[in-house]
Amino acid sequence: GILSTIYIEVNKNVSQNKIKKVLASYYKNDIFIKILKNDTLISTNDVINTNKCHISVCKTKNKNKLIILSAIDNLIKGGSGQGIQNMNLKFGFPLKTGLI
């Protein structure tokens, strides 16, 4: 799997909860994306053999920096799963067909 660690710098008026809410709003209709509770440490074991992506927003010691963690199974969410998902889109099948 792939575990991404993304460091971001935020303005004083942008909180951890605000970032989480933006992500949750953006992905609210995506059945394969799960936004976890703040400061949840994630593992590729949580997404193995799935087309899912788990995302968590974590605090750091520095108040103007946050870490966004994401985990995917690069075989299912990667090449093979991407091919199936694209086929579903092209032919009008339900998005999760062959993936869940």
Task: Give the ranges of each region predicted by the language model.
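NAD(P)-dependent Rossmann-like dehydrogenase/reductase catalytic/cofactor-binding core
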Residues: 54, 59-100
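C-terminal substrate-binding/catalytic lobe of Rossmann-fold NAD(P)-dependent oxidoreductases
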Residues: 1-68
